[in-house]
Each structure stands twice: as C-alpha cells, then as structure tokens.
Regions:
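Small/polar-rich, solvent-exposed N-terminal microdomains that initiate assembly or binding
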Residues: 1-64, 85, 148-153
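Acidic-leaning, charged glycine-interspersed low-complexity segments
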Residues: 96-153
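Residue-level marker of positions within ordered structural domains that often coincide
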Residues: 18, 55, 82, 99, ...
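Short, charged, surface-exposed interaction patches
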Residues: 40-71, 110-130
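Oligomerization/assembly interface segments of phage tail-like spikes and tubes
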Residues: 67-85, 129-141
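Extracellular/virion structural assembly segments
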Residues: 82-99
C-alpha cells in the first residue's frame, strides 16, 4: 500500500542522520502516530510536528462518477526551536532531507511538488520558542484499483 504524504515526510526525517543530529527522532512527531496533546507542551526544543492537511481529488468536476487516480495532497511541517537561526538551520536541513528521500523513491510512489510555502519565523511566548511551518502541496498517484482490492481483502 502506498504511503500518504505525511508518512513519507515522517520516514524521510526520522531516517535522515543530518536531521536526527539536530532533532532526536523521539522529538519528530506526526499525525500518523498518536501523540498525547499534553506531551507536546513539555517537549524539549527543538522538535518537529508533521501534519496531514486536507486534500482535493484531481477530477475535472464534482459531478464525475469516478475519482481520479491522482490526488493533490498537502502536508505541513512545524519546526520549533530556541532561536531564529536554529529554525532556519532546521528548515534548510529538512528541505534537503525531503528532496533526497523523494528522489530515491520509485516514480509511481514519488510525490510531485506542486507548491511550497512557509509562514515565516514567529515567536510563541507560551512555549516560549521560535517556530515556522512549512506547507507542501503535491500531486500523488493512488491507484483506485489498489484501494478496492484492499477494501475487499
């Protein structure tokens, strides 16, 4: 079964030695792994949270009878660190790790980047910490036949 975008990002970041040298894998969280909300409040800096954002099926109109095999999917990566420079370093390291990981994937499983943006470094006085959120929008191929076979099995 093909992985979702947030799962790909989680695997990429937890398996990259440059990322885990800065942020231990135990402080890289994802929506595909249950994390009690209160645990995030006490997590030492730096940490990363990968989010599974809403997506849109790539069909011509909403009146079509069948879904397309291609979906436009989105995921976010929140970076929290003690200084703006630490956020910038992590942002560069994360982007490089994701690019390398995606390039190593097979063509059928590889997400195709559609757009990338970030919110900019901001201060959270409640933590306190600096943070930035990266937003990725990608096209991914999810064969509908595979979904039907999985539901039948």
């Amino acid at each position: 079964m093909q992985k979702e975008l947030d799962e790909i990002f989680y695997d990429a970041l937890t398996n990259d030695s440059n990322v885990t040298a800065i942020v231990p894998a135990t402080r890289i969280f994802s929506t595909c792994i249950e994390v009690p909300p209160m645990e995030n409040d006490n997590t030492p800096l730096p940490y990363i949270i990968i989010t599974d954002d809403p997506f849109q099926d790539e069909q011509a109109t909403k009146d079509e009878l069948w879904e397309s095999d291609w979906d436009t999917v989105q995921a976010g990566i929140e970076i929290a660190a003690a200084s703006p420079n630490a956020v910038k370093q992590l942002r560069r390291t994360i982007r490089h790790a994701l690019a390398q990981y995606v390039e190593s994937m097979s063509d059928n499983e590889r997400p195709v980047l559609r757009s990338f943006s970030n919110e900019g470094i901001a201060w959270d006085w409640t933590k306190p910490c600096y943070y930035d959120t990266l937003h990725y929008q990608c096209d991914m191929y999810f064969p509908i036949d595979d979904d039907n076979e999985q539901n039948e099995g």
